[in-house]
Amino acid sequence: MMEIHTRKGYDINISGMPSHDIEILEKPARVALLPERIPFVKPRLKVKVDDPVKVGSPVFEDKRNPQLVFLSPGGGRIADIKYGPRRVIKEVVIELDPDEDFEAFPVISEADLDGMERQKLVKMIMTGGLWPLFRELPFRDVPNPDVVPPSVIVSLNSKEPFQPLPEAYLNDRIDLFEFGIKILEKLSENLLISTSSDDGFAQNRLNGFVTHTCNGSYPADDPGVLLYHIKKGPDENRSWYINGQDVLLLAMLFKTGKYPVDRTVVLGGSLARERKHLKTRMGVPLNHITKGRADDTGTARYIVGGVFKGYTASKDSYMGFYESSLVLIPQGDEKEFFGFARPGFNKPSRSRAFLSFLNKSSMAMDCNCHGEVRACINCGFCGEVCPVDILPQFTYKTILADEIEEALDHGLLDCVECGLCTYVCPSKIELKTIFKKTKKAYFLEQL
């Protein structure tokens, strides 16, 4: 087992962290697929409103690669298809039947898996709708099934606040996880399984499987950060990664012959009354998660996917294909009289401009930026927290000058989109958003 130490990064001291308690949610009335939240996919619908669907029925495919299909997370009928600007498909809503029907997929035993060719295995995963669980670095797109990756990284947990713990989703399912690992071993000769150095559960229960422990502040255990520290050459840049919880879905597909929809999600944040792990299903409504568990006063910001890497959603929306956390924090619209002159003992900040650096207890955070966007002052704060040694302030300026090649030389593609540069920037510049959009534009140019 190799230990990787990341010097840079930052851990925010935020309140509202979830407990280790696990609650099983009742079945929701509706679930949904959110094509808009799946990067680099141009959806082509295969259903229309009022069409009947089973769990595992095709709902849409990628126009660029029709082999890449996305399946229904519920059995019932298509209740609604919601569009955004320029007819972007935002949500495909499915009203569930009391007794859901399942599409049948082949059941594969461990003996069958041992003698199976890689090409056949890949085709079965794609037909089963789980190929999008794999993401390819550095753009985090769905990988090409015809390419053998230099490595597959299994990320068991995340140092980003409010992510599910391995002991919550792996408890009593170790055998299923081991079968999922055997599936991954057929896809690449180099399988890496990483966990945080402070995760005792994974290191004790999966001692024979964990290959790397990641030591350091957020985002030390991000697959991109791990690859940055261990890669030996540029040919490893296009490695794949998959989350530990998704490995269970692969195993369930082959073990049961049914499209798996189980999900363990986290509800947290200072405005959540019951902060805990919840066992539910893919595409669950956000208001189903928060029902009776949150202060619904209309002042909460619903953040899906984490406070750094997530996105704001309406409370009437649904959990996305990749997301497994819901955070409720105040909007922060209230104005503060002479806020600039106050010592800020309870204002979280990485700098020592406020006295909050003396406060070691967790602090409630809101969405107030406490200022507007202003010019970059070359303070270097963003470079001090960047885990992959980019100098974001200079990369940002090359992008503004439209010098994309120079930005690539600065290490733009190594950016793991952790959001720390945006968080610590005193000029309130959305550095992560700028870098992410630039990477996306560069990726689309290569197609």
Locate each region found by the language model.
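Ferredoxin-like iron-sulfur electron-transfer modules
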Residues: 32-41, 359-380, 399-417
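Buried, small/hydrophobic-residue-enriched core segments of structured protein domains
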Residues: 68, 82-288, 292-343, 347-351, ...
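Metal/cofactor-centered catalytic core regions of large enzymes
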Residues: 349-360
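Residue-level marker of beta-strand positions
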Residues: 52, 58, 75-77, 285, ...
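Short, well-structured beta-strand-loop connectors
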Residues: 47-61, 79-80, 420
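Translation machinery proteins
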Residues: 30-35, 75-77, 81
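Short coil-to-beta-strand transition motifs
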Residues: 67-75
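N-terminal, Lys/Arg-enriched amphipathic/low-complexity engagement segments
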Residues: 1-46
